[in-house]
Amino acid sequence: MAVSNKKMKHFTQGRNRALEVKVTTDQYNRAEKRAEELGVLRNSITNGKSNGWGMLGEEIIRDLLKCTDSDDIYNYDLKTPSGMRLEIKTKKTSMVTAPKPYFKCSVCNHNPRQRCDAYVFLRVSTKVNKAWICGFKSKQDFMKEARFFKKGDTDASNGYKVHASCYNMNISELDHINKIR
């Protein structure tokens, strides 16, 4: 598709859409317990304030894909039954409806050193018991296809000033979670 405004190019890429899931009380409770035990991680953008939301994303994926815990928490979060090592990236949101296909999924600049096979992206609502599994991308494909932003850069597609150097992809550019092995 031809695009006359180069800033709008990001709207035309990919067909993936986020999958809405209901968040259970059990998932909330497990995530809260784990977050309290974890404390503050080095390089945490929110100084540990979002640990519970991150853990909730992990609990959702654990249940959906029947994953087991990582035996190397510094490199990945969960392992699928087939042995695929997943790093779960969760963003909290005040939205109550599915994120738009052009919304961004991010991996911080220091995370590419992690030894995982794929990144899985979620958005978790702070207002309702819903989450959206935005999709996944193999680490190799993500690092090849994502757009890099340095701290202080402004993303021309949405005017967002980047707070930490990161790699971004739109939800529409990810692979649907049902394609994970």
Where are these predicted regions, by residue range?
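Nucleic-acid endonuclease domains
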Residues: M1-M84, K89-R181
